[in-house]
Amino acid sequence: MNRLILCEGKTDAILLGYYLMKTDGWALEKKPPSGLDIKAQERNENVVWYKKGNEKLMICAVGGIDNFGQFFSRYIQRPILNASNGDPFPRIALVTERDDRDIVEIERDVTEQLSPFFVGTKNREWITNNYLDSFGMEKQIETLLIIIPVEHQGALENVMLDAISEDPYDKNIVDKCTAFVAAIRPEANRYIATDRLQL
């Protein structure tokens, strides 16, 4: 079975892939399954395959929060609709960062981007979507939206810093680094102008 994770950016894709390799036994795979040789075409996109036993996983950086729909329609939709021997991706996970937005707003935005192929998305809940393939057969695809972090606004980097900070020794290092970056930010504004870069 093939699995698919769509995420916002290259850093997210790299971190997710690394995490899955270290915690769940996935390994980099150079050869994609037949008919799924999907290549990123834009500078801010990325496509990497992983393998674990007979399962394959493709993690794609779509190039930003507003590009889920465009990336899906350009690269993913055609192989799904034209599949003659099963479903290439029966389950798709969408990983996005909360940043400074509300969860309901993100669910609505992602659903609008992927409409009409997906009828809805809900944070941390599998949703079944029905569609007709190019042969007129009714099929189903399940989607899971994962908004990171759930507890507060922020990005994947916030989750990593929170996890590192669970150890008192490492928390001290994180706190000192955060204070250092905050102190130099006025002078280094040209290099760390956004809150995201300050993380």
Regions found by a protein language model. Give the residues of each.
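Activity-critical C-terminal alpha-helical subdomain
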Residues: D87-Q198
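RecA-like P-loop NTPase motor core
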Residues: M1-G86, A93
